[in-house]
Amino acid sequence: MSDQPSFPSPDHLHPDPFTRSLTAERSLNAAIVQAEISRSFEEYLGIFDEFYADDVEVSSETPEETIPGKARVRLLLLNFLVPLHVMAEVGGLSVAIRESPIPGDAAGETYSSWRLDLVGVSGKTCTLKWRTFRKWNGSSVVMERHYDQQITGRPLTFDDLSFGAVDPVVGFQRPS
């Protein structure tokens, strides 16, 4: 028997890589689902900044479309989020995003299925579905690939949003 105190090993303080990446994946996906695009697009950029590595690579189903680096991916994300935010906040677009985990068995790799429903004020709906594969390094995404993309419904048009002319205010007269 030893008189030296026993301390937990570092392995007890930090879960195994499989658990660590699964926990990070759940946190990232919950943050995405809970964010509200009609309120702010900046919330999504904050999530991206928190969870993605500086050297992240994002791709679609074809390898030629790989986008390297956080700055380039952030710009692409911004070009998607700003118009979506304007359509939701000003145009009355209803936006709902859902995620379902897909079981995996490799440490540092996660899979999920996504659904984005866009509903215009006209009632017209466009649904986008895709799957995501992520590689993690600790709590940071270092690679993300989107695949199995599907679109249901037709793209929404200007007529499906409420950007129409504003009714004149009663009692307000234009200057002559």
Predicted regions and their residues:
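C-terminal and inter-domain tail/linker signature
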Residues: S2-S176
